[in-house]
Structures are given as C-alpha cells and as structure tokens.
Amino acid sequence: MSLGFWNCATTRTSDFVVSVKTEPDGTSWFSLNSDGSRGDLIKINGGGYRMPSSPETLREKVVDEYGNIRSEEQGYMQGADVFNFVIREIPRDIKRLAEWSGEDLQGLDYYVFHQANNFINTYLAKKLRLDAERIPSTIAKFGN
C-alpha cells in the first residue's frame, strides 16, 4: 500500500510544510520547507519560555478591533491568511514531492491530509485531481 501524508503549520518563527510519501518497502520521501515570513499567522504569546505563565498572561482582555477577548495564553490564528498559505503552498509541495519520489499521484492508495477543515481538504483533492474516496476524513466526528 502506498500512502501520502501531508501537513503544514505556522510557528512563531517559521512557516513550514511537511510532506511524506511512504513506499511499501518502508522507503519514505520527505519535503520540509521553512521561511519564517509568516510566523505570526498562528500564535500563542504567553505560557512558554519567552513569556512564562503569570497572572498577567492569564488575564483576559480585549485584544483587537472586533472586541475579541482572550488572554496571552490563548491561541490566535489569522484564518484567511492561513487558508491562503495552505491553498497556495500545499498543492505545489505535494506535486514536487511526487516528482522527486517518481510517483504518479494517482498511483497512491490513500492520501492522508491534516484534518483542519473539510473545505480545504476538498479543495486540495480537486486541485490535485485526487479521488475523494481515497482521502480518509475524521473531521465530521472529531474536528481539527
């Protein structure tokens, strides 16, 4: 069985795409990318090494022009920018990994995407011309 696993993430210091393609004999192909320019798209300011947990980091306050209330220890994501990153970068990276590994994407038995949301996974399937039946999904049952 041939599997393709894809995930992407943004950290405080870098964006990265992780793609893995595994052969039946255990051979794996990885694509790891990082540039750091969008490191603030998903963030949690407090509770870590740079800003240790304290009463101040736990205190909730209005933090943006929309009146959202959160503490420094609650996560924040710039959803539209993350979405644009995913739909621009992930298909390109998946195609590049398939080329490097010598695999036709249509030849994989299953495609395993990060279960962030169904819209993105459906978009990726269409963009890459993949059979949706070979993309397992747990989003409806478990969410992200």
Language-model segments: which ranges?
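Glycine-rich helix-loop-beta junction characteristic of Rossmann-like nucleotide cofactor-binding loops
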Residues: 100-103
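Claisen-condensing/thiolase-fold acyl-transfer catalytic domains that form or cleave C-C bonds
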Residues: 1, 87-95, 105-144
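Glycine- and other small-residue-rich loops at beta-strand/loop junctions that grip anionic moieties
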Residues: 6, 31, 113
